[in-house]
Amino acid sequence: MATYLDFEQKIKIIQEDIISAQVRHDDGLVASLKKNLDKEVSKIFTNLSPFQQLQLARHVDRPYALDYINLLMRDKYEIHGDRHFRDDAAILCYIGYIGEEKVVVIGEQKGRGTKNKIKRNFGMPHPEGYRKALRAAKLAEKFNLPLLMLVDTPGAYPGIGAEERNQSEAIARNLLELSQLNTQSISVVIGEGGSGGALAIGVADRFAMMRYSVFSVISPEGCSAILWNDPAKVESATNAMKITSGDLKELNLIDDIIAEPLIGAHRDRDSAAAAIGEYFLSELKKLRQMSNEQRMEERYKKLTSVGAFSE
């Protein structure tokens, strides 16, 4: 059963009317209602607030990394474990094919349903997850395979065990190694990009965001609690933080915005996956036209140009 957000209620009513008309075989009414639906979708989704985009990024039905991996990849083989401590289920690593390209894919996975959410730790990786990701990235480098990273996490896990196993070092190590990785790399924020947990697989030649994804140094809830001592002011915090794909593109913090379906990736997973696949393959083609030195130099300039200052 589809889940509708508060601002999608008119869409829900029209879609229910369409189903009712289809049951009655009233083709004329179905056609009319579908036109009304297209108009309502355009009206709502072309005027979304940052807070509404945050709700879409966190939508319970939004495709996760594993959904995209299953839709995009074939002949795939999963890579397990960091060879130091354990296998972290919050990070997925696969080698396989996207189209005719042999690739390595790394993704952060939130999980669906209570048992799976617990297994995936709600998409919050431990240090061993980031070390597994680095192991997969190094395999891509060793065999000269392109790397695709799918970012979707509220943040790195802040528990005692994670800190004892040096969470900050694992993230910092990934930032260093991925910035110097000698193969083509593309990172895409598919849902939530939360702080260092997102950055740990976000350093790449190309960094893109899905239309309704978000990327921030802290959650809006955390920001509102710190600034106003009131978690209820999350909407104000969201508006002020500039966390949407449009804001971040304007600030030159990302390279591209991937046009997921206007109504949201959760309503049309196949089209959303196809958009990621097309973006990956087209950007990979561009990266391969560069010399290795040119590509590494461009990556370095991009990473060192992040931020702004005034004297």
From Swiss-Prot:
It comes from Sulfurimonas denitrificans (strain ATCC 33889 / DSM 1251) (Thiomicrospira denitrificans (strain ATCC 33889 / DSM 1251)). Its EC number is 2.1.3.15. This is Acetyl-coenzyme A carboxylase carboxyl transferase subunit alpha. Residues 36-286 form the CoA carboxyltransferase C-terminal domain. The keyword Transcription does not apply. Pfam families: ACCA (PF03255). Keywords: ATP-binding, Cytoplasm, Fatty acid biosynthesis, Fatty acid metabolism, Lipid biosynthesis, Lipid metabolism, Nucleotide-binding, Transferase. Pathway: Lipid metabolism; malonyl-CoA biosynthesis; malonyl-CoA from acetyl-CoA: step 1/1.
